Amino acid sequence: MLASQVVSSVLEPSWFARPTCVVAADLIGKVLCRELTDSDGQQKILRMRISETEAYIGEGDAACHAHAGTRTPRTEIMYHIGGVFYVYLTYGIHHMLNLVSGPTESPEAVLIRAGFLIEGSARLMNEQLLDVNKQLNHIKQLAGPGKLTKGLQIDRTLYGKPITPASKVWVEDDGCQPLVSLRPRIGIDYARDAK
């Protein structure tokens, strides 16, 4: 079956209101979709297979931004019921894409760490084939949350928006069910045992 023939269903925001560790594991293999305008003015949808996530499970998680229970303008959206975006800037240059998960008043989210492009406009795919640095379908090209958001043109304008096609970023399920492995989280040495 060709990629264009695969039947996908859009995940509703309520899908993200489940336990965060379950959501993080279930997101592996799902398809993150991004609607953009191509350089020729045409609308396109990039589809990226999610290959790596990290769960941040609230006030008891030393690596979570809301671990101390302190609500700030930046973390306020994490207290929302699952199904909205939490995007923040780190090191002043990298946007981090998080999907708020779990119930209301429980500040939890799933960081999308890595993925690879599986479908996009033919024009974009052809441009990528000409320049190895632009090959978004290469397994390592969107490896790392900063590379991922840069490649998909995601920034803080997405903060607080629902995870739906109306936001121009959404998640689909096309039936892919890869094996999932659990590993320590990356880049949170400050959280010691919370890795």
Residue ranges and their predicted role:
Residues 2-195:
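Conserved, well-structured core segments that form or line functional sites
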